[in-house]
From Swiss-Prot:
The active site is at 321 (proton acceptor). This is Activin receptor type-2B. It comes from Homo sapiens. Disulfide bonds join 29-59, 49-77, 84-103, 90-102, 104-109. Forms an activin receptor complex with activin type II receptors such as ACVR1B. Interacts with VPS39. Interacts with DYNLT1. Interacts with BMP3. Interacts with BMP2. Interacts with BMP6. The keyword Nucleotidyltransferase does not apply. Glycans are attached at residues 42, 65.
Length: 512
C-alpha cells in the first residue's frame, strides 16, 4: 500500500513545484474568438492548456490594427514554439502584417499585448479595460484546489485497485471518430470569409489563416464517411505533387449535434476549370498548358510508386469523379486535381475498399459505368477516369480561339444533345446505345494542333475501355503536339497532321 502514497506525494510535489522555482509555467491563458458564431465556440473566457509531455506551452494573441483601431481576432493556448521561449510579455515584432501575432510564457500573459517593430518605432500597447471578476471566475478559482485534491485521492484509489491486472482482460478497440482539431491549425486565427462553392457533400469557403488565404471544405456530420475517405487519400504517402491539391489539415469543429468536419487545403483564386471556361476564351498555349498539367496530375495519381521521396509506398489511386469542376487552376493556369472523396487506393494484397460501380457525376460516366458492367480491377477504374478526361479535353478545345472560326458559349459535355440535367436513362441511350460523343466541329480540324488533339480526345473516350489512352500518354502527346505546332512555320502546317499522327505520337498504352 506504500506505492500509491509515494505516487501521491510525487504528484502533489509536482503540482506545487512551479511556484517554488519561479519559472514561467503556462497552465491557463485568456481565451477570445472574434469568429465564435461561425466556429460555434465560446466568445471569451479562460482556456486550460494541454499538450504533449516534455513540450512547452504558451499563450498567444492575434489582432488587427486598422488606422489605430485595435480589432482583437483570437487569444488562447499555443503549442511548443521556440519563438515564444522565455517571453514573459506578448510582443509582436513584424513591421506591418495584416494580422499581428504574439506569444509568451506564463499564466494569462496574453491579457496585455504590444506591437514593437524590430526596426524601432512607436510602441502600441493594448490593455483591456479592468473588469470586476465574474461569478464564474470566482467559482473556478474556489473549486480548483478542491478539484485537485479530489483528483489526487481518486488517482491513489485507482492505483491501489489496479496494482495487478485482472485475469481475462480484453482490449476493446472503438472507432475513435474524427480527430481533435489539428494543434497548429486549430489554434491559429482562421476566419471564414465567403462561400465559393456548394457540392454533393457540403460547401467550400474561402478563409484566412494568419496572413494566407486557404480553402475550407465543410462537411455535415452525416457525411463523415466522405470526409474521412478524402482525409485518408490526402494522408497517403506521396500525395504532395504540384498538380494535386495541397492538403493542410482535417479538423472537427463544434460539439454535440452541431459538429462540423473541416478539410483545409490551399486556395486557388481562379477557381475550377468549369468556372474559368464559362467566363474566358483561351489561347492555344493556354489550352496546352492546362491539358498537359491536368494529365500530368492524373498520371501521377494513377501511378504506383514503390518508394516516394522517402515517404513510403504511394499506391495507384483512381479518382472516380474526374470532371472540369474538380480541376482547379493556379494563377498561371497550372491545373490542380481536387475532390478525392470518391477516390480508391489499390494497394498490393489489400482490397481497394468501397468500389461501388455507379459513383461520380452522371454526365461524365463511362459507357461501362452507365451499363453497370464494370470489371472491378485497377486498370478498369483508371480507364473510367480516362473517359472523363476525354470529355474535359473537349471542353477545353470548345473554348479555344486558335481555330479560324467562331467560339461557342461554354457548354458541358452532352448539354447540346440532352440538356443540363440528363437522367441516367437518357445518358444510357445516348452514350451506350447510340455511342454518341460531344460534337467535334469541322473548323477545329483545320488547325493542325487542334486536329491532333481531337484524335487524342477520341482515343480517350473510346467505347472500348481497353483501347483508351493512359494519362501518361496524353501528357506526352500534348507536349509533343505543342512543340510541333509552335515550332512549325505556316508553309508546312498541312503536312504536319499526317506526319505526326502516323509517326511521332506515343503509343496508346504507356502506363495502364
Amino acid at each position: 500500500m506504500t506505492a500509491p502514497w509515494v505516487a501521491l506525494a510525487l504528484l502533489w510535489g509536482s503540482l506545487c513545484a512551479g511556484s517554488g522555482r519561479g519559472e514561467a509555467e503556462t497552465r491557463e491563458c485568456i481565451y477570445y474568438n472574434a469568429n465564435w458564431e461561425l466556429e460555434r465556440t465560446n466568445q471569451s473566457g479562460l482556456e486550460r492548456c494541454e499538450g504533449e509531455q516534455d513540450k512547452r506551452l504558451h499563450c498567444y494573441a492575434s489582432w488587427r490594427n486598422s488606422s489605430g483601431t485595435i480589432e482583437l481576432v483570437k487569444k488562447g493556448c499555443w503549442l511548443d514554439d521556440f519563438n515564444c521561449y522565455d517571453r514573459q510579455e506578448c510582443v509582436a515584432t513584424e513591421e506591418n502584417p495584416q494580422v499581428y501575432f504574439c506569444c509568451c510564457e506564463g499564466n494569462f500573459c496574453n491579457e496585455r499585448f504590444t506591437h514593437l517593430p524590430e526596426a524601432g518605432g512607436p510602441e502600441v500597447t493594448y490593455e483591456p479595460p479592468p473588469t470586476a471578476p465574474t461569478l464564474l471566475t470566482v467559482l473556478a478559482y474556489s473549486l480548483l484546489p478542491i478539484g485537485g485534491l479530489s483528483l489526487i485521492v481518486l488517482l491513489a484509489f485507482w492505483m491501489y485497485r489496479h496494482r495487478k491486472p485482472p485475469y481475462g482482460h480484453v482490449d476493446i478497440h472503438e472507432d475513435p471518430g474524427p480527430p481533435p482539431p489539428s494543434p497548429l491549425v486549430g489554434l491559429k486565427p482562421l476566419q471564414l470569409l465567403e462561400i465559393k462553392a456548394r457540392g454533393r457533400f457540403g460547401c467550400v469557403w474561402k478563409a484566412q489563416l494568419m496572413n494566407d488565404f486557404v480553402a475550407v471544405k465543410i462537411f455535415p456530420l452525416q457525411d463523415k464517411q466522405s470526409w474521412q475517405s478524402e482525409r485518408e487519400i490526402f494522408s497517403t504517402p506521396g500525395m504532395k505533387h504540384e498538380n494535386l491539391l495541397q492538403f493542410i489539415a482535417a479538423e472537427k469543429r463544434g460539439s454535440n449535434l452541431e459538429v462540423e468536419l473541416w478539410l483545409i487545403t490551399a486556395f486557388h483564386d481562379k477557381g475550377s476549370l468549369t468556372d474559368y471556361l464559362k467566363g474566358n476564351i483561351i489561347t492555344w498555349n493556354e489550352l496546352c498548358h492546362v491539358a498537359e498539367t491536368m494529365s500530368r496530375g492524373l498520371s501521377y495519381l494513377h501511378e504506383d510508386v514503390p518508394w516516394c521521396r522517402g515517404e513510403g509506398h504511394k499506391p495507384s489511386i483512381a479518382h472516380r469523379d474526374f470532371k472540369s469542376k474538380n480541376v482547379l487552376l493556379k494563377s498561371d493556369l497550372t491545373a490542380v486535381l481536387a475532390d478525392f472523396g470518391l477516390a480508391v487506393r489499390f494497394e498490393p494484397g489489400k482490397p481497394p475498399g468501397d468500389t461501388h460501380g455507379q459513383v461520380g457525376t452522371r454526365r461524365y460516366m463511362a459507357p461501362e459505368v452507365l451499363e453497370g458492367a464494370i470489371n472491378f480491377q485497377r486498370d478498369a477504374f483508371l480507364r473510367i477516369d480516362m473517359y472523363a478526361m476525354g470529355l474535359v479535353l473537349w471542353e477545353l478545345v470548345s473554348r479555344c480561339k486558335a481555330a479560324d472560326g467562331p467560339v461557342d458559349e461554354y457548354m458541358l459535355p452532352f448539354e447540346e444533345e440532352i440538356g443540363q440535367h440528363p437522367s441516367l436513362e437518357e445518358l444510357q441511350e445516348v452514350v451506350v446505345h447510340k455511342k454518341m460523343r460531344p460534337t467535334i466541329k469541322d473548323h477545329w480540324l483545320k488547325h493542325p494542333g487542334l486536329a491532333q488533339l481531337c484524335v487524342t480526345i477520341e482515343e480517350c473516350w473510346d467505347h472500348d475501355a481497353e483501347a483508351r489512352l493512359s494519362a501518361g500518354c496524353v501528357e506526352e502527346r500534348v507536349s509533343l503536339i505543342r512543340r510541333s505546332v509552335n515550332g512549325t512555320t505556316s508553309d508546312c502546317l498541312v503536312s504536319l497532321v499526317t506526319s505526326v499522327t502516323n509517326v511521332d505520337l506515343p503509343p496508346k498504352e504507356s502506363s495502364i
